[in-house]
Amino acid sequence: RGKTSEPHIVPLTTFHIKFMDEIKQTTGHDTYLFPSTGGATPRRYDTLTNAVRKFVKASCMDRFSPRDIRRTFKTVAGSMGISLELRNRLQGHAMTDVGSVHYDRYDYLAEKRTAVQAWIDGLSEIVKIKE
């Protein structure tokens, strides 16, 4: 769940699953994808923020925040032909139009799955990822 009370489901591709398996092999932990140092709990969100802040400072970048990743997804996925509605749904934005709020109960899972695969395929072309 995000900011809304609705579940936020983002389908995983085979690339994501393989990537998570590699992370688990690296950490040696099965319960949490990103375990804390002791492994008893998941790593805190601010750990990522702090690591990004240190990296930005050390690399002399002007600035960068994890939010820039969301902005990049929204922009690049649009250039790949993924509709604004699906990009919004994938980012967990609440649909506020009357039809969505009161009538549309469809989960858009199949469309999300297609969009996520298109995203991975597009990134693979950009950075030549091999699944």
Task: Go through each PLM region and give its residues.
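Surface-exposed helix-capping loop/turn segments at secondary-structure junctions
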Residues: 60-63, 125-131
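Active-site/catalytic core of tyrosine-dependent DNA strand-transfer enzymes
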Residues: 11-62, 73, 94
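Active-site-proximal segment of tyrosine recombinases
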Residues: 64-65, 74, 81-93
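Catalytic-site neighborhood detector that most strongly recognizes the C-terminal catalytic loop/helix
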Residues: 1-3, 17, 40, 80, ...
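Active-site catalytic microenvironments for nucleophilic, acid-base chemistry
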Residues: 54, 58, 76, 80, ...
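Short, mixed charged/polar active-site loops
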Residues: 4-9
